[in-house]
Amino acid sequence: TGSFKTVEELCQPSKAQSDLSINNVRATILGGGDMWWDLNTARYEVPKGSNKHSMFAGSLWLGGVDEGNQLKLAAMTYRQAGNDYWPGPLTTDGTASTNKEICDKYDRHWIVLREEVDVHKAWLECLEDPNCNDAELFPGYESQIPESIKEWPGNGVDGELPYQLAPFKDRDGDGVYDYLVDYPAYDIDKEYDC
């Protein structure tokens, strides 16, 4: 027998959980492809603070055909029969595989606020402007850059993955996320018509 291991042997199901509070909704999202519950109770509250939940749970259902023309489906139903979603990116070598190190590293949500990105973008632009005094406008900012911006997974947590993950504004066009040059993508300058 070979040394093939299944994803279940390599990775644990995601434990990442975050609460979103947007407009008049408070909702829980999970890292395992499901959302709006905490594995026991409803967590999609509208209006927030009312203890009224319009949905109990939901999940991503994705399907497609592989290179061998075989239908593949990933669909969660209350995590009752296995797990179809694992933390982190998959390899691009044709195997679409992962490993425990990647699963552990990516079992989290990266939350960045628009206000943080606005300040960071303004600081980066100030650094390039000879008429802008960054020490006066952004005193001590470089040593206080938010972790959410420093750790943004544009190319992998440690840059070990060769492809882009989370979207970012690539200001120097090198394809590599560097928080001292780039910032997490928000359409701040209204460049996109969506």
Regions found by a protein language model. Give the residues of each.
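A long-range scaffold signal marking pre-active-site subdomains of enzyme folds
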Residues: T1-C194
